[in-house]
Amino acid sequence: MTIHHDLRPTLNLIRLANGEGLDLPAYESKGAAGMDLRAAVDEAAPLTLQPGKRALVPTGFIFEIPEGFEGQVRPRSGLAFKHGITCLNSPGTVDSDYRGEVKVLLANLGDEAFTVERGMRIAQMVIAPVTQMRVAESAAASETTRGAGGFGSTGV
């Protein structure tokens, strides 16, 4: 089924000076859930990530995520599989009221140094709906069949 009406919310991006010349974050296939984020590192000074080390990598953009949504920063499977490069704090949450540059906390879990070059696709962002709950304190938890069983209590 094809839907001909574009009712998707708009994601406004503000390009920062270090993002000049970079492609906009984009969905790389028709069915992609996440848009790829690119590294806004200095072209003359790529970032080399040694094994076991981590670094905060700029994207060059501020994301104005609509209220009622969040941005989830996630690893790219190819970088993880081929090089051991992943995102710490994954998924990292970008709140709708955050107005700073989106950065990616990359870690090298591989055995070799990895060079992050300008414009390289380093992570993906999934925009997802969120619900803020009304919080109330209760004297006791309600009864369920499962009860307090956790961490494998329903089987492995």
Curated annotation (Swiss-Prot):
Binding site for substrate: R76, S77, G78, N89, T93, V94, D95, K103
CDD domains for this protein: trimeric_dUTPase
Pathway: Pyrimidine metabolism; dUMP biosynthesis; dUMP from dCTP (dUTP route): step 2/2
UniProtKB keywords: Hydrolase, Magnesium, Metal-binding, Nucleotide metabolism
Coiled coil start-end: none
Enzyme class: hydrolase
InterPro entries per the UniProt record, alphabetical: dUTPase, dUTPase-like, dUTPase-like_sf, dUTPase_trimeric
GO MF, any single term: dUTP diphosphatase activity
GO biological process, one term: dUTP catabolic process
EC number: 3.6.1.23
Keyword Secreted: no
Catalyzed reactions per annotation: dUTP + H2O = dUMP + diphosphate + H(+)
Cofactor names: Mg(2+)
Domain of life: Bacteria
Pfam families: dUTPase
Keyword Hydrolase: yes
HAMAP family xref list: dUTPase_bact
Family that this chain belongs to: Belongs to the dUTPase family.
Summary of the function given for this chain in its UniProt record: This enzyme is involved in nucleotide metabolism: it produces dUMP, the immediate precursor of thymidine nucleotides and it decreases the intracellular concentration of dUTP so that uracil cannot be incorporated into DNA.
Name of the featured protein: Deoxyuridine 5'-triphosphate nucleotidohydrolase
